[in-house]
Curated annotation (Swiss-Prot):
<keyword id="KW-1208">Phospholipid metabolism</keyword>
<dbReference type="GO" id="GO:0016024">
    <property type="term" value="P:CDP-diacylglycerol biosynthetic process"/>
</dbReference>
<feature type="transmembrane region" description="Helical">
    <location>
        <begin position="206"/>
        <end position="226"/>
    </location>
</feature>
<dbReference type="InterPro" id="IPR000374">
    <property type="entry name" value="PC_trans"/>
</dbReference>
<feature type="transmembrane region" description="Helical">
    <location>
        <begin position="131"/>
        <end position="151"/>
    </location>
</feature>
<keyword id="KW-0443">Lipid metabolism</keyword>
<dbReference type="GO" id="GO:0005886">
    <property type="term" value="C:plasma membrane"/>
</dbReference>
<feature type="transmembrane region" description="Helical">
    <location>
        <begin position="165"/>
        <end position="185"/>
    </location>
</feature>
<keyword id="KW-0472">Membrane</keyword>
<keyword id="KW-0808">Transferase</keyword>
<feature type="transmembrane region" description="Helical">
    <location>
        <begin position="65"/>
        <end position="85"/>
    </location>
</feature>
<comment type="similarity">
    <text>Belongs to the CDS family.</text>
</comment>
<keyword id="KW-1003">Cell membrane</keyword>
<keyword id="KW-0548">Nucleotidyltransferase</keyword>
<comment type="pathway">
    <text>Phospholipid metabolism; CDP-diacylglycerol biosynthesis; CDP-diacylglycerol from sn-glycerol 3-phosphate: step 3/3.</text>
</comment>
<dbReference type="Pfam" id="PF01148">
    <property type="entry name" value="CTP_transf_1"/>
</dbReference>
<keyword id="KW-0812">Transmembrane</keyword>
Length: 227
């Protein structure tokens, strides 16, 4: 029998999912347009994302100079690398694929965790994350990447991304790193007693909550892209 507190928790989770969907309806088309057809908009979005992440990082870590300084390094780097990659027209599908991977792993990990449940991934850092969610998210992200490669006019010059087998493997690796990046931010939020880094994005929290995965994945993407 579900208690009143349990019912309230389920209702809150349901509302959160609806808000995530609504946010996605706005954010996803905006980024697709920016990446594929209007490069200046992507630059603006990256600047806004970077500013938002830095602002929320400061609000979270201002009491600790070492952690504050870490943010001044690890946030500008991925923003700069993604912006640099996007300057080359031939990389537009690479950037598009990248966001498909890091966003799909987050969504499918949540769905997989709620569906299959099971052992917790890191109960002290992020109590809601499960091993089943991680596996579901990583494999789904790899599948999404392969399916995306069949879109008409899809083309990535890099061999490792154009080969379907390598694409699946690399996408799974990026998805796994994205989850590690998410856990890193979750650890910091626990350390500094913060539930969400902000509230600007409905259903997600702050900019840092939504884009935390780029911190570790963007450098990896850049490295693979120049091989």
């Amino acid at each position: 029998m579900i208690t009143q507190k349990g019912k309230e928790h389920l209702a809150k989770d349901k509302q959160n999912i609806y808000l995530r969907i609504l946010s996605g309806i706005v954010l996803v088309p905006l980024f697709v347009i920016a990446i594929l057809w209007f490069k200046p908009l992507f630059y603006i979005l990256m600047i806004l994302v970077g500013m938002g992440m830095l602002s929320e990082w400061y609000n979270m870590t201002y009491s600790s100079i070492p952690y504050l300084l870490i943010g001044l390094i690890i946030i500008p780097i991925p923003i700069s690398l993604l912006t640099f990659l996007s300057m080359e027209d031939t990389n537009r599908w690479l950037i598009m694929l990248y966001f498909c991977i890091i966003w799909s792993v987050d969504s499918f990990a949540m769905i997989g965790g709620k569906t299959f449940k099971g052992a917790k991934l890191a109960p002290k850092i992020s109590p809601k994350k499960t091993w089943s969610g991680l596996v579901t998210g990583v494999l789904s992200a790899g599948l999404v990447a392969v399916l995306a490669s069949f879109i008409p006019n899809f083309h990535i010059e890099n061999y490792y991304f154009s080969n379907k087998i390598y694409l699946f493997i690399i996408s799974c690796i990026l998805a796994l790193i994205a989850q590690s990046s998410d856990l890193f931010i979750s650890y910091l939020k626990r350390k500094f007693n913060i539930k969400d880094s902000g509230h600007i994005i409905p259903g997600h929290g702050g900019v840092l909550d939504r884009f935390d995965s780029i911190i570790l994945t963007a450098p990896v993407l850049f490295f693979i892209s120049i091989l």
